[in-house]
Amino acid sequence: MRFGYWTPVYGGFLRNTGEEGGMEATWDYVKRVSVLADQLGWDITLVPELYLNDRKGIDAPSLEAWSLSTAIAAVTDELRIMTAVRPGFHLPTVIAKTSATIADISSDRFSLNVVSAWWAEEAKQYGGVFASHDERYIQSSEFVRILKGMWRDDRFTLQGRFYDVPAAVLSPKPRVAPRIFAGGESESGREAIAAFADAYVMHGGTPDEVAPKVADVHARRRRLQGGDFEEVGMAAYVIIRDTEKEALAELDRITTVDPGSPGYASFEEFERHSNLDVELTKREYSVGTRGLRPNLVGTAEQVAERIGEFQNAGVDLLLVQSSPLHDELERISAQLFPLLGVESRAVLA
């Protein structure tokens, strides 16, 4: 199992909690976390792309993903960087060029997470294209064809439904094409992703929910691309404490739902515009991306046992949220990594 974490572009992760132990939506904090994670041996960070804050409410600060990703690449040595991109907000030719440059800056540690969007209000405010659910996956497919074509060919041409690229040149090309991650749960989403992505990422679930999903997307990719996905990642919110009682107390603290909180409206819009294959609970609203559904809550030994079930289900990358992140990255590295055979350089005081 490899371990990654979400870069805190919103400051914190919790919708029901205001201040999160010094987590702030600033480059200073992101730099602190990035350097720490790199030193501790974390494998990858997912940098979400949202121009509005869907955790703390749209009036709260949030940082821009692409400028952050370039900066993270410059201050780390080993940490892989997975930057989210929504095709409705970008030209694929420009993203191909930008990605090639960040790949060079990072010595080929850069990858993309293609997100087919869900937030109509954000698209309205920032001028993004917000097509219907199935249309967004068609657009994403064309978008990735252009990325891969420009990274590969001397001149790339495509006349598509969404894009017209007339013999475009990209130089210098990346030494290694950035890996394309993507996630989706609907029938159309899984089919499209199996055709264009290299790796699959999903929101949190139970082992019984995840295992058939992983088997399904691998089978689709074998049919459409001739092989399994190179990685399968899952979002998870992790709470590790010295005793189970302490962990459950923290869980109770962060899941006391306030329907009047600023982030509640964006949660309801996410439900409306995403064809999910499970029903979300208000508890899952508390942290987003169904991060609590895997139930990685307890002592390090209990969480390690649970992670073993996800390994058996086919997950090989956990994308962790936890709060406050700077403390929890070190706690997880020191207490959990050794139980799973993951090299850790953490030393808790």
Task: Report the location of each language-model feature.
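N-terminal beta1-alpha1-beta2 module of alpha/beta enzyme domains
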Residues: 1-75, 175-178, 347
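Conserved, mostly hydrophobic/aromatic
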Residues: 3, 37, 41, 72, ...
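Hydrophobic faces of well-ordered beta-strands that scaffold small-molecule active sites
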Residues: 3-5, 45-47, 80-85, 110-114, ...
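An alpha-helical appendage that flanks or caps ligand/catalytic pockets
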Residues: 5-9, 35, 39, 126, ...
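Active-site mouth loops of central-metabolism enzymes
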Residues: 13-28, 84-93, 129, 174-185, ...
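Catalytic domains of carbohydrate-active enzymes, especially glycoside hydrolases
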Residues: 28-48, 192-203, 309-315
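Acidic (Asp/Glu)-rich catalytic clusters
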Residues: 38-39, 70-78, 99, 103-110, ...
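Alpha-helix-loop-beta-strand connector modules within alpha/beta enzyme cores
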Residues: 56-82, 139-143, 223, 330-348
